[in-house]
């Protein structure tokens, strides 16, 4: 329990300080501080992200972020992608997943360096939101991340959303995406579900 508390607390603090999603922090901490393998940790991380994203998303809504109908397309794409990514996890070797995760960390570093400054072009085509949802959902299901580190720039560039609106969209879409990934990976294992819940609540 203490390790889960530390993982949730440290993950939550670093996520807030660095402006990155919880999964980018939770997965490495779980891998370092527990004896579970990488694939299991991605499922636990997805479970934790449900709670972290719910709290953050609620804050954005309370602060007046307006959600358009396009959020539904993003959510549908995320659910489909989350399921696909979760199924792919079982088919890909652990070492390969770890390498993919390492590449993601490099992308995170680059995005932090760019400080979220992206040129955008307004687009209301639902197709773009569905594709963005699927692509980021696959990453979420595959690696146990929220997907915002990729989803937000795509929403700004292809959806023409302002940064703060894109963040709100991303957080809301993360919740059902992470739920899909967590249920697919952890179904039938209440102990792992409980661990992910604790981390999410502590975060």
List where the protein language model places each region.
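Membrane-embedded alpha-helical segments of transport systems
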Residues: 47-55, 172-180
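Alpha-helix initiation and capping sites
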Residues: 148-149, 173
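Small-residue hotspots at the loop-to-helix junctions and early N-terminal turns
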Residues: 42, 46, 163-171
């Amino acid at each position: 329990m203490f390790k889960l508390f530390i993982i949730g607390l440290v993950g939550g603090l670093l996520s807030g300080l660095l402006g990155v999603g919880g999964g980018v922090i939770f997965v490495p901490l779980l891998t370092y501080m527990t004896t579970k393998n990488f694939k299991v940790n991605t499922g636990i991380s997805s479970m934790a992200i449900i709670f972290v994203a719910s709290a953050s998303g609620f804050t954005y809504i309370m602060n007046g972020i307006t959600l358009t109908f396009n959020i539904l397309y993003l959510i549908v794409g995320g659910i489909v992608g989350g399921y696909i990514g979760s199924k792919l996890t079982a088919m890909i070797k652990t070492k390969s997943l770890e390498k993919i995760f390492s590449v993601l960390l490099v992308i995170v570093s680059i995005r932090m360096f760019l400080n979220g400054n992206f040129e955008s072009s307004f687009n209301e085509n639902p197709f773009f939101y569905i594709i963005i949802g699927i692509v980021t959902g696959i990453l979420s299901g595959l690696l146990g991340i929220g997907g915002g580190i990729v989803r937000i720039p795509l929403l700004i560039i292809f959806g023409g959303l302002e940064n703060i609106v894109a963040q709100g969209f991303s957080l809301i879409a993360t919740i059902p995406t992470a739920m899909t990934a967590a249920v697919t990976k952890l179904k039938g294992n209440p102990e792992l579900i409980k661990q992910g819940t604790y981390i999410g609540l502590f975060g």
